[in-house]
A protein has these predicted regions:
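Structural recognition of the conserved hydrophobic beta-strand(s) that form the central parallel beta-sheet
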Residues: 351-359, 383-384
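Conserved Walker
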Residues: 333-349, 365-371
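Conserved glycine-centered beta->alpha loop in an early N-terminal alpha/beta scaffold
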Residues: 2-224, 299-300, 304-307, 367, ...
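Phosphate-sensing "switch" segment of ASCE/P-loop ATPases
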Residues: 348, 370-490
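P-loop NTPase catalytic core of nucleic-acid-dependent motor ATPases
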Residues: 190-281, 480
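AAA+/P-loop NTPase substrate/partner-engagement loops
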Residues: 265-310, 314-320
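DNA transaction DNA-binding modules
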Residues: 164-223, 434-637
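Loop/turn-to-beta-strand initiation segments
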Residues: 305-308, 350-354
Length: 637
C-alpha cells in the first residue's frame, strides 16, 4: 500500500498523510540517483579526491566504480568495494536512544539495498554488524584496519544533516503527535523534529495489508452477522485509541460450545489489522494461541501492541499459573526478568484490546485451579458467552450459517489489513469547525468526550431495562463505550459496511450478555471468603487453642478456640468482623452465605453469632466448620 492508495481508501483523508508516507521512498530515490551516478565514475584509487564522487558523503569520503574510499592527504583507505551512501538517521523521541544510520549500496548483483546500522550494536559487536552488511551485499572489508575507518564513516554519517526518522518502540499512536505506526506503515501528518516514522524492529509480516478495503468490506458485509462478529470489529478498531482515550488493556473473552463460531469471531476482529486466516494455516496468520509458554505469549502480545491481539483456545493453556498470567496480560506488563548478568531486562510492554476464545469462561478457568476473578480484573477480563444462534440470520439453517463461516475463513486469508489503516488515517484527518486539522490533544479530548457520551447512553438504556451496575461494572462499561465510539465512527466514515445503529445494537447485546452471566461476574463476598479461608489455613495453628484445654498457651494475637468434638473454628466476633471489614463486606452478609452453604453453625435461624457455654470462656463467636478449610469456594459459592 502506497501513499496514493492511502487517500483513496476512504473519503476525508487529508493529503498530508499521503505526503508524509511518501517521504522515505522519495528520499531513497534521491540517494539511488546519486549511487547511479557514482558507480559510473572511474576514480583514481591512489587519489580518490581528484575524480571521486563526494556527493552525499561525509568530508574526506568518495565513491566511484571501484567502491567507497576515505582519502585525506596521502592517506587512502578503501572502505568497501561497493559504493555506499547514507540515506537517513534514526533515533528515539528523546534523541538519545536507538540511534542508527541507514546506508544504501548497489550490491554485487546490481540490487539497491538499504541497511540500518545501529550505533549500539556497532559498539557492542562490530563483527556482527559487518557480517550483516556483507550478507546483504555490501563490499565492506573484514580487515581490522579498514574496519576502524568504516566505524568512523558511520559515526560521521550520524553527524550529517540527513533526514531524521523517529524510531517507535511499538506500534500505535506517538505520544503528543498526530501520528500512528501501523505495522511498518506510518500514518501521520507530520512529527515535530522528524521526517519519518519507523518501527524499532521489523513488524510481523502478517500485518502488511492484502487485497483492498472495498474487497474486505464486501466479504464482511456478505458474510459477517450477529453481535459477536460486529462487536469484534468495533473492539479491534477501539484498540487503536486506548492511549488517547486514557484507557489500558482490556481482554474480551468469547466462550461457548464447539459450534458457536468463536474462532471466526477472532478472525473477523484480526482481519481489521492483519492476516485473519485460520489459525495455523499459514505463517502470516496473526492469531495467537493460548497453548504456549507465558514468556512467549507476553513477547507475542508486545509485537501487536497498539493494534489488537487475538488468542485462540483458552482450554489448551494448562499451566497452573493462569491467575498470574492473567494479571500480567491485563496489566500490560510482563513479569520482571533478569539477563545472564543478573541485571533487569528491558520490560516487555503492550497496550491494546485482546480478543480471546475458549469453551470455558475466564472465571471457570480460574475455578479449575481453585482461584477466582479478582475485583481489579472484572473490568479488564470480560467473559462473553456466545451461542450458535448468535451468528444465524432469520430463517437461516445450520448449514447456511456454517457455509458463511467457511467463506469468512477462506476470504479473510486474502482480504485483510486495510480497514485499520483507513480508520486511523480518517481519524487523524478530522478537522475543527474552522477547517484546521485537530491537534493530538484535541483528538484525545474528542475521543474521551465521545466515549463519555456513549457510556452515558449505554448506562441510561441499561437503567431503563432495570439493571443496577456496581462501581466496577461502570468501569467496564467505559470499555464497551469506547468500542461503540470507534465502531460508530467507522460506520459513519463508510469503513465498516454497517449502519451505526447496528454497531450500537451489537455493543449493547455484548453488554447485556456479560451482565446477565451472573456466574461469571466478580463476587466481592467470594473474594472475602477466599481471603478468610487462606488466612485460616495458613495461620490457624498459631492463633487458636482448644476450648477445654485450661493449660493451653494463649497467644498474644488470639483469634478463638477449636471445638472439642468437631474441631470447628470458633472465631471471636471482632476478629471475624475485622476480616470482613478489610474487604468492605458486612459480617452478617458473609456469615449468611456461609450458613446457607452449611459452613457456619448459627445459634438460631438468622442469628449467626454464638456464645460459648463454658464458664471459663467469655465472648461472642462465629463457629466456622472445619470442612470450610477444604471447600472449593469458586465452585461452591
Amino acid at each position: 500500500m502506497n501513499g496514493d492508495i492511502l487517500t483513496s481508501l476512504a473519503d476525508g483523508i487529508d493529503l498530508s498523510l499521503n505526503q508524509f508516507l511518501a517521504k522515505k521512498s522519495l528520499n531513497e530515490a534521491r540517494v539511488a540517483r546519486i549511487l547511479d551516478k557514482a558507480i559510473n565514475i572511474e576514480l583514481d584509487e591512489d587519489d580518490p579526491s581528484q575524480s571521486g564522487c563526494a556527493t552525499g558523503l561525509p568530508a574526506g569520503h568518495y565513491n566511484g566504480s571501484a567502491g567507497a574510499f576515505f582519502a585525506r592527504g596521502k592517506k587512502v583507505v578503501q572502505i568497501s568495494s561497493t559504493v555506499i551512501i547514507p540515506c537517513a538517521r534514526r533515533c528515539s523521541q528523546n534523541k538519545q536512544l536507538n540511534m542508527s544510520v541507514d546506508l544504501m549500496t548497489i550490491n554485487h548483483i546490481g540490487q539497491k539495498v538499504v541497511v540500518s546500522v545501529s550505533l549500539d550494536e556497532l559498539a557492542r559487536n562490530p563483527e556482527l554488524v559487518i557480517a550483516d552488511l556483507v550478507s546483504k551485499g555490501f563490499g565492506v572489508t573484514t580487515f581490522v584496519h579498514s574496519r576502524g575507518y568504516l566505524e568512523r564513516f558511520i559515526h560521521a554519517c550520524m553527524k550529517m544533516a540527513l533526514p531524521m526518522y523517529l524510531v517507535a518502540e511499538s506500534m500505535g499512536m506517538v505520544e503528543g503527535e498526530a501520528a500512528f505506526l501501523h505495522g511498518d506503515m506510518p500514518l501521520a501528518r507530520g512529527i515535530s523534529g522528524f521526517d519519518y516514522l519507523v518501527p524499532h524492529k521489523s513488524a510481523f509480516s502478517g500485518i502488511r495489508p492484502s487485497g483492498s478495503l472495498a474487497g474486505w468490506k464486501t466479504v464482511i458485509k456478505d458474510n459477517a452477522h450477529g453481535w459477536p462478529q460486529l462487536f469484534a470489529l468495533s473492539s479491534s478498531l477501539a484498540s487503536t485509541l486506548l492511549g488517547m482515550a486514557g484507557m489500558d488493556v482490556a481482554l474480551f473473552h468469547f466462550y461457548g460450545g464447539s459450534t458457536t463460531g468463536k474462532t471466526v469471531v477472532l478472525q473477523v476482529g484480526m482481519s481489521v489489522h492483519a492476516h485473519g486466516g485460520e489459525p495455523g494455516s499459514h505463517p502470516d496468520v496473526a492469531i495467537l494461541r493460548w497453548n504456549t509458554t507465558d514468556n512467549a505469549l507476553e513477547l507475542s502480545l508486545s509485537e501487536f501492541s497498539g493494534l489488537v491481539a487475538c488468542i485462540d483456545e483458552l482450554g489448551a493453556y494448562n499451566d497452573r499459573k493462569f491467575s498470574s498470567l492473567l494479571y500480567n496480560i491485563t496489566s500490560g506488563r510482563a513479569k520482571i526478568r533478569l539477563d545472564k548478568s543478573l541485571r533487569r531486562r528491558k520490560p516487555v510492554l503492550w497496550k491494546m484490546n485482546i480478543l480471546s476464545s475458549g469453551e470455558m469462561s475466564i472465571p471457570e478457568k480460574l475455578a479449575s485451579y481453585n482461584e477466582q476473578l479478582q475485583g481489579g480484573q472484572e473490568h479488564r477480563a470480560i467473559s462473553l458467552n456466545i451461542l450458535p444462534e448468535d451468528a444465524a440470520k432469520e430463517g437461516e439453517s445450520v448449514e447456511e450459517v456454517r457455509r458463511r463461516a467457511d467463506t469468512l475463513k477462506a476470504e479473510l486469508a486474502e482480504q485483510y489489513g486495510t480497514a485499520g489503516k483507513a480508520f486511523i488515517a480518517r481519524f487523524l484527518s478530522q478537522q475543527n469547525d474552522d477547517g484546521s486539522l485537530m491537534s493530538y490533544s484535541e483528538l484525545s479530548e474528542q475521543i474521551k468526550d465521545t466515549t463519555t457520551v456513549c457510556c452515558q447512553m449505554l448506562a441510561k438504556e441499561l437503567q431503563s431495562d432495570g439493571y443496577v451496575l456496581s462501581d466496577i461494572q461502570h468501569r467496564a462499561l467505559k470499555r464497551f463505550a469506547l468500542c461503540l465510539a470507534a465502531g460508530g465512527m467507522a460506520a459513519e466514515w463508510d469503513i465498516l459496511p454497517f449502519e451505526p445503529q447496528m454497531i450500537k445494537d451489537s455493543v449493547m447485546s455484548a453488554v447485556r450478555r456479560w451482565l446477565d452471566d451472573g456466574l461469571n461476574q466478580y463476587n466481592p463476598v467470594k473474594e472475602a471468603l477466599s481471603a478468610i479461608q487462606l488466612e485460616l489455613i495458613k495461620r490457624q495453628a498459631a492463633h487458636f487453642v482448644p476450648l477445654q484445654d485450661k493449660e493451653a498457651y494463649i497467644p498474644s494475637n488470639h483469634w478463638g478456640y477449636t471445638h472439642p468434638k468437631t474441631q470447628d473454628l470458633m472465631i471471636f466476633a471482632p476478629v471475624f468482623d475485622d476480616w470482613c471489614r478489610r474487604h468492605n463486606r458486612k459480617s452478617a452478609e458473609v456469615a449468611k452465605l456461609l450458613s446457607a452453604k452449611n459452613y457456619l453453625e448459627p445459634e438460631s435461624k438468622g442469628h449467626y453469632k454464638k456464645r460459648v457455654q463454658n464458664s471459663d470462656v467469655e465472648g461472642v463467636f462465629y463457629q466456622i466448620k472445619r470442612s470450610f478449610l477444604h471447600c472449593n469456594i469458586s465452585a461452591e459459592f
